[in-house]
Design a protein with these regions (language model features):
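Inter-lobe coupling linker of SF2 helicases/translocases
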Residues: 2-43, 53-91, 99-101, 119-153, ...
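Short, flexible, mixed-charge acidic loops at enzyme active sites
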Residues: 26, 105-110
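Flexible beta-alpha connector loops of hexameric P-loop NTPases
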Residues: 113-118
């Protein structure tokens, strides 16, 4: 790539992440991340609530983890060979861009449902490479059918990738500023995970200024809805009629409810006991946890036989 004049180079996500960035660029990126963490820690401390004590500890652990990565890079003395920044990439098209949605967000709202907290190395790697291309005068294009899958907060991640300069112009320097501008945390009663009662839960799920948010996002987004795509297929000479997605009878899915078997009712009671034990720290996380409970419950809802370990 570095010594040839290709029109395009196509590679899979797995191959892309194997191309490293120059250590110096990585160090600058990580130091910027540390600055963001310091700001988030200061804001969490300024809040002063008992609830934010746990948030501060979480952010400080994240800061130490980033500082550890800085030390690792600083200790590397060997020649890296050809790195991504030396390949001369001036335009990057990323298909299935939702695969990189787990870009870690530094926030004082980490204990609130609806705020993304997942972090993946491949998302951080993609973000670093996107920023390098953009700062070098190049362009980045994302393509995905699911830019938002779990929460509206994922839109902030897409904006970080594609229009961070616009966020800076709007004085939105972090997720908390974005959340205050476009959303609100709501406290409400919800059915507990095991279904045995109710619990008070805070969720980031009320939004406002939506027209302004979408106008901002549409500066970088071309959005195609299902009906728009269906119309394009119907009017296309390249597509056959049978390529049109079939419609549900009555234009919507029909839910068929059935009574649980006695065995399933017994299993649900066991799920409640497991959940209580987990919440009371009566069981070690490696022995049982909510991820296992959720997975087992999904299997049981299909067929109890799927829980049998062969």
């Amino acid at each position: 790539m570095a010594v040839n004049n290709y029109d395009a180079v196509i590679m899979g996500h797995s191959s892309f992440k194997l191309i490293p960035m120059d250590n110096e660029i990585q160090l600058n990126f990580l130091n910027e991340e540390i600055d963001k963490l310091v700001t988030a820690i200061e804001e969490a401390k300024a809040n002063g609530s008992h609830q934010n004590t746990a948030v501060v500890k979480l952010l400080e652990r994240s800061k130490k983890a980033v500082e550890k990565n800085v030390k690792k890079l600083t200790d590397i003395k060997r020649d890296q060979g050809i790195t991504f920044d030396k390949l001369g990439v001036d335009y990057m098209f990323v298909d299935e861009a939702h695969e990189f949605k787990n870009l870690y967000t530094y926030t004082a709202m980490s204990n609130i449902a609806g705020v993304p907290q997942a972090r993946s190395q491949k998302a951080s790697d993609m973000y670093m490479k996107c920023k390098f291309i953009q700062k070098s005068g190049g362009n980045v294009c994302f393509a995905t059918g699911t830019p938002i899958t779990n929460t509206m907060a994922e839109l902030f991640t897409m904006q970080r990738y594609l229009q961070e300069e616009e966020l800076e112009r709007l004085n939105i320097h972090n997720f908390d500023a974005w959340a205050k501008t476009f959303g609100k945390v709501i406290t409400s009663l919800e059915v507990s995970v095991d279904g045995s009662g109710f619990q008070t839960r805070q969720r980031f799920n009320k939004f406002f200024n939506i027209p302004e948010l979408m106008n901002s996002f549409r500066e970088v987004a071309e959005i195609q809805t299902e009906s728009m795509l269906n119309n394009a297929l119907e009017n296309s000479k390249l597509q056959r009629k049978r390529a049109i997605p079939p419609k549900h009878v009555g234009d919507k899915a029909k839910v068929v409810s059935i009574e649980p078997s006695p065995e399933l009712e017994d299993y649900i009671a066991n799920v409640v006991e497991r959940t209580e034990a987990i919440h009371n720290s009566a069981v070690a996380p490696y022995e049982d946890n909510m991820l296992k409970v959720t997975s087992d419950s999904k299997k049981a809802s299909i067929d109890l036989l799927s829980l049998i370990h062969i």
